[in-house]
From Swiss-Prot:
Official protein name in the record: N-(5'-phosphoribosyl)anthranilate isomerase
Keyword Amino-acid biosynthesis tagged: yes
InterPro entries: Aldolase_TIM, PRAI_dom, RibuloseP-bd_barrel, TrpF_fam
Domain of life, source organism: Bacteria
Family the entry assigns: Belongs to the TrpF family.
Source species: Streptococcus pneumoniae (strain Taiwan19F-14)
Keywords of this entry: Amino-acid biosynthesis, Aromatic amino acid biosynthesis, Isomerase, Tryptophan biosynthesis
The EC number(s) this enzyme carries: 5.3.1.24
Taxonomy of the source species: Bacteria, Bacillati, Bacillota, Bacilli, Lactobacillales
Length: 199
């Protein structure tokens, strides 16, 4: 069964909706963005998340110190890193790691010490997709997430195309820039039950 990560949550109501609907991962964005939360805000929201739902912190080109502070203060289960990744960034972290990879047409998949890879559009969180034909996941060492422009209408096709470990959505479950609780529920329902969208 493909797992689901709902990313960019910043309110109690959205976290509760995602958890009750069956999300496997909840993502908190610590990088500058309209979805950014502070460590203190994330720590409060994390109290609403049961142990079987994993808490993910999202960072852009962080230092190891930043990661360790967030892991400690929020109780993160995973860190997801976009941008520059130092060679030793993921070594001996007290939690699992995800390295984000922008799919930009060159088909390059980096050698990574991360536990998981996440394939995203060139501009993460934009709602834009990438050309699925540009990504060959054959022979990958790590389980991988698919992100980038996913929504309730195309997520089943993405799962059929890639057979990923998990799918990741943020803007695809928003209306007017805010998390839409019905869209969160429908997205998870489609993933868990394989119901194709209308488009």
């Amino acid at each position: 069964m493909t797992k689901v990560k709902i990313c960019g949550l910043s309110t109690k109501e959205a976290v509760e909706t995602a958890v009750s609907a069956g999300a496997d991962y909840i993502g908190f964005v610590f990088a500058p963005s309209k979805r950014q939360v502070t460590l203190e805000e994330a720590a409060e929201l994390a109290k609403l998340i049961p142990a079987d739902v994993k808490k993910v912190g999202v960072f852009v080109s962080p230092s190891r110190v930043e990661l360790l502070e967030a892991i400690d203060k929020v109780g993160l289960d995973l860190v997801q890193v976009h941008g520059q990744v130092a060679a030793d960034l993921f070594e001996n972290l007290p939690c699992a790691s995800i390295q984000a990879v922008q799919v930009d047409g060159n088909g390059h998949v980096p050698n990574s010490q991360a536990d998981y890879l996440l394939f995203d559009a060139p501009v993460a969180g934009s709602g834009q997709s990438f050309d699925w034909g540009q990504l060959d996941t054959t022979g990958l060492a790590q389980p991988f997430f698919i992100a980038g422009g996913l929504n309730e209408d195309n997520v089943v096709k993405a799962i059929q195309h890639f057979t990923p470990y998990a799918v990741d959505v943020s803007s695809g479950v928003e209306t007017d820039g805010q998390k839409d609780h019905e869209k969160i529920r429908r997205f998870i329902e489609r993933v868990k039950h394989g119901i194709s969208g209308t488009k």
